[in-house]
C-alpha cells in the first residue's frame, strides 16, 4: 500500500481540495492506486453484501499479525471509498480494527453528508464486513 497516503496526509490532502468535485476526483484517484485484486479473490466468500456495486474485500493476517486488506469494486467512487477505509485500517492488528472507530475520521473529512444514501450504506457495509471478519481473527 505504498502508493496510498497515511491517515494524516489523507486528511490534509482532502481538506486542500477546493470543492466536492475535487474531493470526489481525489477519492477516485485513491481507488486507482489500489493493487490489482487477483481474479480468484473475486468470489462469493469475499463479496460485500449491502452495496449496490459489486465489492470484494480480502483480509489476510501477515507474519507480524498485521491485517492486510485488498479489494476491488466495479464502481470508481466505491473503490475510492474502499481505499479510504484501507488507509484508516492500515498497519492494524485484527483486534485494533475491531476497536478502531473510523467514523470520527469521516466526520473530519465531512464525508457522510456528501455521499448518496446508497453509497453511505455501501460504506457502512464495507466497514461492518471488515470489522466482523477481524473479530473472527482476533
Curated annotation (Swiss-Prot):
Gene3D superfamilies in alphabetical order: 3.90.1010.10
Keyword Membrane listed: no
Recorded GO CC terms: cytoplasm
Main location, first listed in the record: cytoplasm
Keywords: Cytoplasm
Pathway assigned to this chain's UniProt record: Cofactor biosynthesis; iron-sulfur cluster biosynthesis
Active site, per annotation: 51 (cysteine persulfide intermediate)
Localization in the cell: Cytoplasm
Any GO BP annotation: iron-sulfur cluster assembly
Pfam (any one): SufE
Subunit description: Homodimer. Interacts with SufS.
Function: Participates in cysteine desulfuration mediated by SufS. Cysteine desulfuration mobilizes sulfur from L-cysteine to yield L-alanine and constitutes an essential step in sulfur metabolism for biosynthesis of a variety of sulfur-containing biomolecules. Functions as a sulfur acceptor for SufS, by mediating the direct transfer of the sulfur atom from the S-sulfanylcysteine of SufS, an intermediate product of cysteine desulfuration process.
Entry's family note: Belongs to the SufE family.
The protein, known as: Cysteine desulfuration protein SufE
Gene: sufE
Amino acid at each position: 500500500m505504498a502508493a496510498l497516503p497515511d491517515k494524516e496526509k489523507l486528511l490534509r490532502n482532502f481538506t486542500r481540495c477546493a470543492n466536492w468535485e475535487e474531493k470526489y476526483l481525489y477519492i477516485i484517484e485513491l481507488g486507482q492506486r489500489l493493487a490489482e485484486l487477483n481474479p480468484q479473490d473475486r468470489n462469493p466468500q469475499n463479496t460485500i453484501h449491502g452495496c449496490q456495486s459489486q465489492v470484494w474485500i480480502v483480509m489476510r493476517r501477515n507474519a507480524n499479525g498485521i491485517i492486510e486488506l485488498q479489494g476491488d469494486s466495479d464502481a470508481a467512487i466505491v473503490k475510492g471509498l474502499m481505499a479510504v477505509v484501507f488507509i484508516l485500517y492500515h498497519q492494524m492488528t485484527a483486534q485494533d480494527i475491531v476497536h478502531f472507530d473510523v467514523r470520527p475520521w469521516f466526520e473530519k473529512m465531512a464525508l457522510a453528508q456528501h455521499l448518496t444514501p446508497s453509497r453511505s450504506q455501501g460504506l457502512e457495509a464495507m466497514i461492518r464486513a471488515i470489522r466482523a471478519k477481524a473479530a473472527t481473527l482476533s
